[in-house]
């Protein structure tokens, strides 16, 4: 399992910055997705981190607020916002609303590709849980040992 805190501290992605209060940082990230389409609200799923440049809501404060509210309502893990592309910084209104609803917003440095973040999330989410793997091996060895002594 990967959490928002894990992503913020990932050695592979130095420079990710938390812009909101330290709320819901233990939220599990189940997948990463790119949000560059205003119709995408219909396809959001809980546990996603949504990555955006902000292009779809550049000059639309109402859509910026709707985005934060929709992500919070869907229990999305976080919003990753790539700055220095269409926005020099994340609008304060978005940060304030995200604080109010408990949605973490991460600032993504301009030089990062979204694929770097998606790849890391996919690797971490899909890697086998070491504890479960070790327990399975232990059970198999115990079972084999019992069968050998029957």
Task: Please provide the spans of the model-predicted regions.
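Alpha-helical/coil-rich non-catalytic "connector" segments in signaling and regulatory proteins
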Residues: 1-147
């Amino acid at each position: 399992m990967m959490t928002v805190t894990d992503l913020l501290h990932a050695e592979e992605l130095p420079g990710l910055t938390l812009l909101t209060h330290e709320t819901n940082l233990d939220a599990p990230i189940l997948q990463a997705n790119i949000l560059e389409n205003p119709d995408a609200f219909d396809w959001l799923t809980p546990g996603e981190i949504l990555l955006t440049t902000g292009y779809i809501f550049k000059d639309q404060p109402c859509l910026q607020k709707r985005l934060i509210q929709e992500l919070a309502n869907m229990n999305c893990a976080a919003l990753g916002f790539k700055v220095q592309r269409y926005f020099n910084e994340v609008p304060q209104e978005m940060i304030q609303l995200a604080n109010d609803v408990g949605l973490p917003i991460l600032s993504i440095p301009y030089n990062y590709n979204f694929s770097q973040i998606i790849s890391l999330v996919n690797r971490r989410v899909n890697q086998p849980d070491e504890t479960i793997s070790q327990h399975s091996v232990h059970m198999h060895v115990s079972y084999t040992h019992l069968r050998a002594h029957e």
